[in-house]
Amino acid sequence: MAVLQVLHFPDERLRTIAKPVHEVTPEIQRIVDDMFETMYAEEGIGLAATQVDIHQRIIVIDVSENRDQRLVLINPELLQHDGEAGIEEGCLSVPEQRALVTRAENIKVRALDRDGKSFELETDGLLAICIQHEMDHLMGKLFIDYLSPLKRQRIRQKLEKLYKQQARAVN
């Protein structure tokens, strides 16, 4: 397994629409395993393949406190959604930034697991929010796209400052 490089906003590759996985092969399973390793190393709760410059419809999630409830969603489809829940979201691709985003409170999804078996999942709360957030990545969308242009611009400026500080620290 390997820790992959996470793309950061405003990298345009984050805007790429992911393509469906046609067959769950050992290579796809390796990508899933690398994505989990990356997500845990970055202390995230979810990761879409788009975020690591792999433009296939693959998501990994683990919202458990003990980091022992892995969820793999390959080719996820949102079947149902209702209610509204607002939560302050963050993102590994938008470091150190958080914002309130409103999403469906209850969802039902269909996807393939790591072995290529189809399943359906009805969920709510943090897991429902996380699934929707990661599915957005597969469509080239970021949580900051739900914000006003002014708030997005402020986040962009903060990130540019952060990236400059990080670059100076490395040199």
Swiss-Prot record:
Q: Which InterPro entries match?
A: Peptide_deformylase, Peptide_deformylase_sf
Instruction: Give the Gene3D superfamilies listed for this entry.
Output: Peptide deformylase
EC assignment: the record states 3.5.1.88
* BP terms from Gene Ontology: co-translational protein modification; translation
Q: Please indicate which superkingdom the organism of origin belongs to.
A: Bacteria
Which CDD domains has this protein been placed in? Answer: Pep_deformylase
What does the record note about the cofactor?
Answer: Binds 1 Fe(2+) ion.
Kindly list the residue ranges recorded as spanning the membrane: none
What are the names of the required cofactors? Answer: Fe(2+)
What top-level class of enzyme does the UniProt entry assign? hydrolase
Extract the Pfam families matched here.
Pep_deformylase (PF01327)
Give the keywords, sorted.
Hydrolase, Iron, Metal-binding, Protein biosynthesis
Binding of Fe cation: at which residues? C91, H133, H137
Q: Name one GO molecular function term.
A: metal ion binding
Q: Which residues form the active site?
A: E134
Its recorded reaction(s) are: N-terminal N-formyl-L-methionyl-[peptide] + H2O = N-terminal L-methionyl-[peptide] + formate
Q: Of which family is this protein a member? A: Belongs to the polypeptide deformylase family.
Entry-linked HAMAP family: Pep_deformylase (MF_00163)
The role this protein plays is: Removes the formyl group from the N-terminal Met of newly synthesized proteins. Requires at least a dipeptide for an efficient rate of reaction. N-terminal L-methionine is a prerequisite for activity but the enzyme has broad specificity at other positions.
**What's the name of the protein?**
Peptide deformylase
According to its UniProt entry, this protein's organism is Edwardsiella ictaluri (strain 93-146)
Q: What is the lineage of its organism?
A: Bacteria, Pseudomonadati, Pseudomonadota, Gammaproteobacteria, Enterobacterales
Q: Which gene encodes it?
A: def
